[in-house]
Structures are given as structure tokens and as C-alpha cells.
């Protein structure tokens, strides 16, 4: 709830009624992929040579799930629209205090978005894709 998730320096719950959805922590805190190592697969020798010095981490694309709740239909619509506007800014800095002080510097891709709303029109789930261009840059 309050204080669990911060987006662009704002408390997501108090600002937009947004909480982390299913699998949020697993997705954002998952292991990182490595960039391919430099290889030379020459026909002149058996196997291949690999340069293992100076390994680098690759960018990553993650899907995050959110829940958004309003106190009424009008409150829900206002919060939903404001949250959507925040995502449309492109740059989305996410901090989850239970994972430490690191800030995940993400870019909202606006693709593969799924959305579902309850029949009372006061609650929804949102699943959206983000890119983390440099997963090693998580400083404040």
C-alpha cells in the first residue's frame, strides 16, 4: 500500500491508487542477461576461442503488472488517466523500498499492454512492457 512503490519520485498508491500486481517483484528483481562474449570459430582449430574479459550486461525488456483502485467511478477514472499520462512521459523511474534504495530507470514501451476492469468500474489490472536500457545504472 502506501510506501510500497514509488514511480518518478511519487508514492504510487497515494498519487494514483496503484499497487504492485502479481509477479511484479519477480519481474523487476530478476537476474540480468549478459551480452554475448566475443567469439572466434576458426576452421583452422578445434572448438572456438572466447574472450571472457570485461563481461557486460545486456539491456532488458520486462513486463510489470499493476493494480489501480479508485474510491468511486469518477475517482477511478481520474486516477487511471493520471497514471496513463505519467507512463506516457516515457521515462519511468521505479523504486521499491523492500528491494533497497536502487532506482530502476525504465522506459515505457506502450506495447503488449493488457488491461482489465471490474464490473463496478473502480478497479483494474494493467500489464505493460518496459525497457531497462542499462540495468547496471540503478543509482539515485
What residue ranges belong to the model's regions?
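Extracellular/virion structural assembly segments
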Residues: 1-140
Amino acid at each position: 500500500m502506501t510506501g510500497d512503490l514509488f514511480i518518478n519520485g511519487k508514492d504510487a498508491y497515494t498519487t494514483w491508487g496503484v499497487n504492485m500486481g502479481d509477479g511484479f517483484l519477480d519481474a523487476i528483481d530478476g537476474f540480468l542477461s549478459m551480452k554475448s562474449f566475443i567469439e572466434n570459430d576458426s576452421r583452422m582449430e578445434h572448438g572456438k576461442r572466447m574472450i571472457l574479459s570485461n563481461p557486460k550486461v545486456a539491456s532488458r525488456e520486462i513486463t510489470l503488472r499493476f493494480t489501480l483502485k479508485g474510491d468511486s467511478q469518477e475517482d477511478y477514472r481520474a486516477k487511471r488517466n493520471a497514471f496513463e499520462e505519467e507512463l506516457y512521459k516515457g521515462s519511468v523511474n521505479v523504486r521499491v523500498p523492500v528491494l533497497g534504495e536502487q532506482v530502476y530507470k525504465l522506459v515505457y514501451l506502450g506495447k503488449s499492454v493488457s488491461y482489465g476492469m471490474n464490473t463496478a468500474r473502480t478497479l483494474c489490472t494493467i500489464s505493460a512492457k518496459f525497457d531497462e536500457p542499462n540495468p547496471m545504472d540503478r543509482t539515485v
